[in-house]
Design a protein with these regions (language model features):
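Conserved phosphate-binding elements of NTP-dependent enzyme cores
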Residues: 1-918
Length: 918
């Protein structure tokens, strides 16, 4: 029975209030609502979990033991559920071998393509390497006119331990009667064998060409014999001519024997194809060019090469500078403008100067001197493998080409350019037949990657360097590539990290997934995606304990009329106001000559003491500018140590009033189930002390540690403060039972008897932050209330004090970090805060609260810089830096800077176009 909808009955997981809701089948459905209202609980923890569980239940018990054990979610029943696929916004892999190409399977098809139709070219002459088969020789013979007399010859080599006479005797015994020597045929006779011959050929057969099948069969046998006797070589020559045609069944040219292409030759995960030096990683521990030339804006003359500074070592630099004119080396050109060949020359050296490679080798040879060991250690780091130059494959793999390009050349092209390469690829009919299916798969997958807005990535980009939004969209493209039908796709905010311009393409992808015959369910706050949805479910009305109900369900038009927060913001009845005036400030930081990744040597000024937003389409260079240049550069300026800094020339500006810089990302605040928001913001210590000071606690000699579930003392000994006991059931889901000893309250009975104003420690941990703030204010515990207040300000009032950090979303984790800074910010320190997409997972109403918190930080004298795509956030900024124009190689330029009003007037800026609509 196939129902028209998926019906969820009585969902009660987390804060869901026993809800029943129908989701139309084969439609694009958006689940929206405030952060913490229960959207993910419904979509992932109920619907997806049940879909997965039913699939696993259908397998044999033998297969089940190898799979994760799945709990049954708290729901009465789900009718009409389909197989479920969840695509979440986590960077899934930390494996350094995984690349965009391998995770989307495009690379697997490329390997096959090169193995099937790639041609091998000699690096010496550039000629194609071919090996001949018996058929090639037969075809060559058949091209002669009927009746032509030919000789089939095989070259003979004399082994070291034999004489010419012995070899000829052996040939005679094998039934051969003639040899060709110096263009004349000599007949072999037992008693009169020639003694001192060099370079002669054996006549394997004399043939008269006939164009019939019998002749071809006889000839093929003879050619086989000729190849055997000639150790892979043979010749044909007309009986009365002197010109010979050479054939070889060995894969060689220019004195090199080449490897025949097969799939493993192109795999860097296979020992056969991987570069032997770096094992296919592309980088090794060695001399790090970024440490040797830390400032690429300097020229060799200006001491760009750090190890060659100072009195002792400057001799090496002087050698190069004084002799540079002899080999035309530009010593006054900045390092970043040098060609790859010129940089390689500095490494390799020549007869006029010692290169860096030999310079460091000398140091290694004399490493018994302590100063040499120190110098070597200073310039060591992870660096590109010098053997394969980061291409990961053994050099033989790059001799194989299609249309002049090796597989390494192709994976270094942005996906958009790769698509053009395959569109313009000219193949012979035979190659077309062999490669037809492979090309179809490659082109489809590349198209999907372009459709989800990732056309700027290259296939050799490592998976662990992608942002959460990028890796989610790669998973989405991979799912599209597999073209499943009749499934249920559940996506967690696919618009994260996407500029509004790219969201339109994403909507196209979601619709094509739906049109294949799938139900696409998206947890989303983006207005454009809601407009495109067939059906919207709004969960609310508020968050936490005040949420968990379906407050509206229907089309976009129906939602506009609904009396819910989502409806009010969408219809304009509620709105995030544009600030009355924009701040200005004399303090600023300027980065001069930014050229890391795709940045085009730009100068960028970040004003301080205000809200600055960095925008631009996906892949335009925002993260590079802020995460790889600004953040580590300021850390270094303030002597805070820090990460490796990307490439730029210098830092200028008025920023000496800053005492520190904080990068607030979306990584979880704690993996342990015992970690919770109040331990992170250091409020739990005060609460434990408060309980330890109660009369009963003093009588029982309890200290504050007795009120912690992380150390022995007061916590329940049976469940170790977890509140539940896990029983492993071999083939079924682990059963989580409430601990019988403490009844799920985590503490010993005698600890729970200690009360403060009618609440014990367990009651308090189950109180929401909103209620706890009111409770502590009422009982004059203002210190604790003040510490909890920032959590309320950032919109986390719905979270309970003891909620496990492992259940928080990325957006919630980021806001807890923000709250911890807000609670600390009474100090006189001036801090620069950098946020990476803080609106992730936020409803319009939550964005409003977040903006208030950020404005509060700025009012306290701090500076805030944000990477953001959300137009509500951008329009509230004091200053906007827009990068572009496109992503990848076409990005990295400064398109516009100024107030949001100035950006909106800029004709070139994509961001401006979407700001106008606001």
């Amino acid at each position: 029975m196939k129902t028209e909808e998926i019906l969820i009955k009585g969902a009660k997981l987390h804060n869901l209030k026993n809800i029943t809701v129908g989701i139309p089948r084969n439609k694009l459905v958006v689940i929206t609502g405030l952060s913490g209202s229960g959207k993910s609980s419904l979509a992932f923890d109920t619907l997806y979990a049940e879909g997965q569980r039913r699939y696993v239940e259908s397998l044999s018990s033998y297969a089940r033991q190898f799979l994760g054990k799945l709990d049954k979610p708290k729901v009465d029943n789900i009718v009409g559920i389909a197989p479920a696929i969840a695509i979440q916004q986590k960077v899934n892999t930390s494996n350094p071998r995984s690349t965009v190409g391998t995770s989307t399977e495009v690379y697997d098809y490329l390997k096959l393509l090169f193995a099937r139709i790639g041609k091998t070219y000699s690096p010496i002459s550039g000629q194609e390497v071919k090996k001949h088969t018996v058929t090639d020789v037969v075809d060559a013979v058949m091209r002669y006119p009927e009746g032509t007399k030919l000789l089939l010859l095989a070259p003979v080599s004399i082994p070291k331990d034999r004489t010419v006479e012995q070899v000829l005797k052996l040939l005679l015994q094998q039934g051969y009667a003639r040899i060709l020597y110096k263009e004349e045929i000599i007949r072999l006779e037992e008693d009169n064998l020639p003694k001192n011959l060099d370079n002669f050929q054996l006549v394997v057969d004399r043939v008269i060409v006939r164009h019939d099948e019998d002749f071809q069969h006889r000839l093929a046998d003879a050619v086989d014999t000729a190849f055997f006797e000639g150790k892979g070589e043979c010749y044909i020559q007309e009986m009365d001519g002197v010109v010979q045609t050479h054939f070889s069944n060995r894969f060689e040219l220019d004195g090199i024997t080449f490897l025949e292409p097969n799939v493993h030759l192109f795999s860097f995960n296979n020992p056969y194809g991987a570069c032997p030096k770096c094992d296919g990683y592309g980088d090794t521990i060695g001399l790090d060019e970024d440490l040797i030339v830390p400032n690429t804006g300097l020229s060799v003359y200006e001491n760009a090469i750090y190890p060659w500074r100072g009195e002792t070592m400057s001799w090496f630099r002087d050698q190069l500078v004084n002799n540079a004119y002899k080999f035309d080396f530009p010593i006054h050109k900045p390092w970043f403008e040098l060609t790859d060949e010129q940089k390689q020359l500095v490494w390799d050296g020549n007869k006029y100067f010692t290169g860096l490679t030999d310079f460091f080798k000398e140091l290694e040879d004399k490493s018994y001197k302590i100063q040499n060991r120190v110098l070597l250690a200073r310039y060591r780091g992870k660096t590109r493998c010098h053997e394969c130059h980061g291409k990961r494959l053994r050099k033989e793999a790059n001799y194989v080409k299609i249309a002049g390009k090796s597989i390494s050349d192709l994976v270094e092209l942005p996906i958009e350019e790769l698509q053009i390469f395959f569109k313009e690829l000219k193949l012979t009919d035979y190659e077309q037949e062999v490669a037809k299916r492979l090309l179809l798969e490659i082109n489809n997958r590349l198209q999907f990657l372009a459709d989800v807005g990732l056309g700027y990535l290259t296939l050799n980009r490592k998976s662990n360097t992608l942002s959460g939004g990028e890796s989610q969209r790669i998973n989405l493209a991979t799912s599209l590539g597999s073209s499943l039908v009749g499934s249920m796709y559940i996506l967690d905010e696919p618009s994260i990290g996407l500029h509004p311009r790219d969201t339109e393409r994403l909507i196209g992808v979601l619709k094509s997934l739906r049109d294949l015959g799938n139900t696409v369910i998206v947890v989303e706050h983006d207005e454009d995606i809601m407009k495109a949805a067939d059906y919207i479910i709004d969960i609310g009305p508020e968050a936490g304990t005040h949420g968990g109900e379906v407050v509206a369900a229907g089309t976009y038009e129906e939602l506009l009329k609904a009396d819910t927060l989502t409806g009010k913001y969408l219809s304009g009845r509620l709105a995030i106001e544009v600030p009355k005036k924009r701040r200005t400030s004399p303090q600023y930081i300027t980065l001069v000559g930014c050229r890391e990744n795709n940045l085009k040597n730009i100068d960028v000024t970040f004003p301080l003491d205000m809200l600055t937003v960095v925008t631009g389409v996906s892949g335009s260079g925002k993260s590079t500018l802020v995460k790889k240049l600004l953040y580590p550069a300021i850390q270094k300026e303030l002597d805070l140590g820090g990460e490796k800094i990307g490439q730029f020339t210098k830092i200028e500006g008025k920023y000496k009033h800053l005492q520190s810089v904080e990068f607030v990302d979306q990584n979880p605040i704690g993996k342990s189930t015992r970690s919770n928001p109040i331990t992170y913001i250091k409020a739990y210590d005060d609460i434990r002390t408060l309980f330890a000071n109660q009369k009963l606690a003093k009588m029982r000699n309890f200290q504050s540690k007795h009120f912690s579930f992380n150390v022995d003392g007061g916590r329940c000994e049976v469940c170790k403060g977890e509140g539940e006991v896990t029983i492993e059931m071999q083939f079924m889901a682990d059963v989580h039972l409430t601990c019988e000893a403490c009844g799920g309250k985590r503490f010993k009975k005698e600890v729970l008897e200690v009360m403060y104003e009618g609440k014990n420690i367990d009651d308090l941990l189950n109180t929401t932050i909103d209620d706890a703030v009111a409770f502590f204010q009422k009982h004059k515990q203002t210190k604790i209330a003040e510490k909890l207040k920032p959590l309320q300000d950032v919109g986390l009032g719905y979270v309970t004090l003891g909620q496990s950090s492992s259940t928080l979303s990325g957006g919630e984790a980021q806001r807890i970090k923000l709250a911890s800074f807000l609670s600390k910010s009474d100090s006189k320190e001036k801090v620069l805060f950098i946020f990476d997409e803080p609106t992730t997972g936020l409803h319009f109403h939550d964005i409003r609260k977040l903006l208030d918190s950020l404005q509060a930080l700025i009012e306290k004298g701090h500076s805030v810089i944000i990477i953001e795509h959300n137009t509500e956030m951008i329009k509230s900024a004091d200053y906007v830096i827009d990068l572009g124009l496109e992503g990848g190689a076409k990005g990295g330029n400064l398109v516009a800077t100024g107030t949001p009003e100035e950006i909106a007037k800029n004709k070139q800026s994509y961001t401006g176009k979407y700001l106008k609509l606001k």
